[in-house]
């Protein structure tokens, strides 16, 4: 049985990620295992700016933003694994994506659960697997590659 730690609210997310509105895509971390996994959520509302154009008559949360949210969750997990805090010059940069698949649409009113798992790290390159779910149904899966760098 893995020992888990409690999650943290939006202030904890803001303390670790450099992203801000409208590009901060994680609302809360539900649970972390500081060794290898994290569960976060995003509440999707009709007031999100992307729905002005994607698509006005039938709003659908863009799949590429689901991938970005998974990457943000991976960054949060990276900071938790290393037990470090964000500083102005330290970022997890999106370095690559493999095997991205979209299974269902995400629409206003949905709560998206993001589950990310650390796979390996080599020479500053981190690999994670992630999935987005709505009501237990998989919306998106991907392998995310990040590089922690001082910028």
Swiss-Prot record:
Top EC class, one word: lyase
EC number from the UniProt entry: 4.2.1.59
Pfam family, one: FabA
Alphabetized Gene3D superfamilies for the sequence: Hotdog Thioesterase (3.10.129.10)
Family in the record: Belongs to the thioester dehydratase family. FabZ subfamily.
GO molecular function: (3R)-hydroxyacyl-[acyl-carrier-protein] dehydratase activity
Active site residues per record: 54
GO cellular component term of the entry, any: cytoplasm
Record keywords, A-Z: Cytoplasm, Lipid A biosynthesis, Lipid biosynthesis, Lipid metabolism, Lyase
SUPFAM superfamilies according to UniProt: Thioesterase/thiol ester dehydrase-isomerase
Source organism (scientific name): Idiomarina loihiensis (strain ATCC BAA-735 / DSM 15497 / L2-TR)
Record keyword Lipid metabolism present: yes
UniProt-recorded name of the protein: 3-hydroxyacyl-[acyl-carrier-protein] dehydratase FabZ
InterPro entries: FabA_FabZ, FabZ, HotDog_dom_sf
Chain's gene name: fabZ
The protein's role, per its UniProt record: Involved in unsaturated fatty acids biosynthesis. Catalyzes the dehydration of short chain beta-hydroxyacyl-ACPs and long chain saturated and unsaturated beta-hydroxyacyl-ACPs.
One annotated GO biological process: lipid A biosynthetic process
Disulfide bonds: none
Catalyzed reaction equations: a (3R)-hydroxyacyl-[ACP] = a (2E)-enoyl-[ACP] + H2O
Keyword Transcription regulation in record: no
Source species, domain of life: Bacteria
Localization in the cell: Cytoplasm
